[in-house]
Amino acid sequence: MNYKIRSIRADEWAAAKELRLVALQDPVAHLAFLETYDTALAQPDSFYQERAVGAAEGAEKAQQIIAEGPDGEWVGTVTVLLEEAGTVDWAGFAVERKQGHLVGVFVRPEVRGIGLTEVLFDAALEWAWGRGVERVRLIVHEDNERARRFYGKVGFVPTGVVVPLGGNADERELEMVVERP
């Protein structure tokens, strides 16, 4: 596999934006992401610039890790957010211990199945463990079977925590975690 796995640099915001827009056009994007393509497209460049700075190499609270092909094209990504004990997460739940939270998982369809997602997850977990987190979690839509199978394959287990999705009581997301080794 001739792919480079690395953290983004702050000046690579345009590539991060482009990959995000591709991800939001995926057939299961409505299950995988809270943001829509139209919403993301309407964001000003400054939004993506700030997002890149906050998750670039050297950032302390988040890290966006990408898979870069031999031609320089970004073909996959995952972002790790650090959540500190004593805070409240995006869904309004109390964070009881220092943890990582994986978001924005995406690999282009043409390179799925060759192990890139596993390598991206390994890099994300390594970054999180290096910051002293006790566990890493993610939230997955209950109907996103493909993602749930993959997360289980790489060691994430359901916690039983259910996150209601927006104003629709019929749709839920499930928390899955991997504990620090």
Where are these regions (language model features)?
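C-terminal "cap" of GNAT-fold acetyltransferases
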Residues: 134-137, 141-148, 152-181
